[in-house]
């Protein structure tokens, strides 16, 4: 499931989740943050490619402020499942993921932010050459097992 779908299902109580793992999540088509500008090109994930993907996903629908598309515009996230948010320091999506984690916390949702210093978007797929990636995977597993145990 992608982040907007989980947001909609969980906040409408259509789905009961012990937790969610958001790994360098994309939270909307209009990325306008410091990290999206600083890491827009040359850091694996290109902002122009991300916008193209959203255009394909949304078609002609242009209401990017709809929380079903961009959960950062949600009026209320009360009842959303606990979240583990994995961010890479050198990722254009970093700042919006951190902002979403803050929004979840504002509505009383338990959030763990795991930031990989010096890493790029997609670093978890490189665990065979980046030992720190496996440390993040272990941290995610630990937090997720706690969420499930407390569900």
PLM regions with names:
Residues 1-151:
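Alpha/beta-hydrolase superfamily serine-hydrolase fold, recognizing
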């Amino acid at each position: 499931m992608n982040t907007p779908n989980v947001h909609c299902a969980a906040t409408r109580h259509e789905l009961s989740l012990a937790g969610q793992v958001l790994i360098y999540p994309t939270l909307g088509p209009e990325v306008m943050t410091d990290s999206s500008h600083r890491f827009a090109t040359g850091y694996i994930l290109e902002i122009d490619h991300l916008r193209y993907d959203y255009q394909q996903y949304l078609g002609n629908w242009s209401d990017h402020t709809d929380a079903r598309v961009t959960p950062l515009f949600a009026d209320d996230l009360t009842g959303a499942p606990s979240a583990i948010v994995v961010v890479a320091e050198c990722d254009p999506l970093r700042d919006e993921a951190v902002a979403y984690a803050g929004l979840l916390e504002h509505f009383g949702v338990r959030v763990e932010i795991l930031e990989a210093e010096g890493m790029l978007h997609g670093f978890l797929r490189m665990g065979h050459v980046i030992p720190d990636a496996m440390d993040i995977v272990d941290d995610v597993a630990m937090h997720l097992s706690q969420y499930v145990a407390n569900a």
